[in-house]
């Protein structure tokens, strides 16, 4: 999910909760248990968001939200993933989220490979990638997006992410102007293309074709190569809401 605030949007979260319910039912649970992981840095995400994630999930269907909150600089205990049917990683300062989930990475990969539904919200979506865009607004001292979207970083910064999807992900695309960061990172060869997701919009990645839910678009960015494999440009298109 590319961010935004839509606590009453049943479409955005209904599929995720339904998949968690199927997984829970397989072990005899009538109500799915969903881990909600939140990292707070300088009161971001705000109390409204921290308290609102369970309500957003409930809009998608009956579930039990198990919320764990840590401060930036701290890490999650691996026990937060015990006996759950779904995992939501929330939004906030993206580098802090990647640091906080470090002890969970191998376990998350195994669980998702085994069918555990994963929902990344803003920062949680960005770190789901093989190579995660953590933030930044400059490439070689050249501005590539608004500084307000920099995540407390100057140069555009990447790191190994959770490895759940093989394309880079940026968020708040139309609202914060981060699409240009992904375009510039692709043209510079920092990433091999990816997607930038609008707010109140979800990209669903599963065994079938990619799907888009919500009110916005998912912007697909791909490098254009010459016969020698050198990047000569970037193509941009949208995956529209079905």
Can you annotate each of these PLM segments?
Residues 1-29, 39-47, 55-56, 134, ...:
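C-terminal and late-domain segments of enzyme folds
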Residues 33-35:
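Conserved beta-strand elements of the Class I
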Residues 51-64:
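Short helix-loop-beta junction
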Residues 62-78:
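A short, well-structured beta->alpha microelement
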Residues 78-82, 112:
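A short, aliphatic-rich alpha-helical micro-motif
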Residues 88-91, 111-133:
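Catalytic nucleophile loop
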Residues 94-103:
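Glycine/threonine-rich flexible loop motifs
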